[in-house]
């Protein structure tokens, strides 16, 4: 029993050290390639990712019939492919687990496709919480 508890604790600690919890200013810097794309400002993205994933690059949210992955919570029904949804449209032509690492390059490429196809309203948090009063989402320490 003790070895099971030890193994469980090691597993939890290992997972915690792999997770990437970004700060507001880190997100601001990381998303510079999205500045103005689709008419969306950086403060809007900082706000949207905060309310979508809490700046956690390894955030996974399971819904009834789909799962959303990463900083941008990209859905496996349409945009990426995983074992849960092997018949996904996979418009971004990528495995969903690629959205769970610290390299946001592929995430941003997919986000641009989402913006081109459906716009910023794909992210419900944007319309509800991030379309005005954006001063708090600026980063002074660039």
From Swiss-Prot:
It comes from the Eukaryota. Glycans are attached at residue 64. Mammary gland specific. Secreted in milk. The keyword Disulfide bond applies. GO terms for biological process: defense response to Gram-negative bacterium; defense response to Gram-positive bacterium; lactose biosynthetic process; response to 11-deoxycorticosterone; response to dehydroepiandrosterone; response to estradiol; response to progesterone. SMART domains: LYZ1. The keyword Signal applies. InterPro entries: Glyco_hydro_22, Glyco_hydro_22_CS, Lactalbumin, Lysozyme-like_dom_sf. Ca(2+) binds at residues 98, 101, 103, 106-107. Disulfide bonds join 25-139, 47-130, 80-96, 92-110. GO terms for molecular function: calcium ion binding; identical protein binding; lactose synthase activity; lysozyme activity. Regulatory subunit of lactose synthase, changes the substrate specificity of galactosyltransferase in the mammary gland making glucose a good acceptor substrate for this enzyme. This enables LS to synthesize lactose, the major carbohydrate component of milk. In other tissues, galactosyltransferase transfers galactose onto the N-acetylglucosamine of the oligosaccharide chains in glycoproteins. This is Alpha-lactalbumin. It comes from Bos taurus (Bovine). The gene is LALBA.
């Amino acid at each position: 029993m003790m070895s099971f508890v030890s193994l469980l604790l090691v597993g939890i600690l290992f997972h915690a050290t792999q997770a990437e919890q970004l700060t507001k200013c880190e997100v601001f810097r990381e998303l510079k390639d999205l500045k103005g794309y689709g008419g969306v400002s950086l403060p809007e993205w900082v706000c949207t990712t905060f309310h979508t994933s809490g700046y956690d690059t390894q955030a996974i949210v399971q819904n009834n019939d789909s799962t959303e992955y990463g900083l941008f919570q990209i859905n496996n029904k349409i945009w990426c492919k995983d074992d849960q949804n092997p018949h996904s449209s996979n418009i971004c032509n990528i495995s969903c687990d690629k959205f769970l690492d610290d390299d946001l390059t592929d995430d941003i490429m997919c986000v641009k496709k989402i913006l081109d196809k459906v716009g910023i309203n794909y992210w419900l948090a944007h319309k509800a919480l991030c379309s005005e009063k954006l001063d708090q989402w600026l980063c002074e320490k660039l």
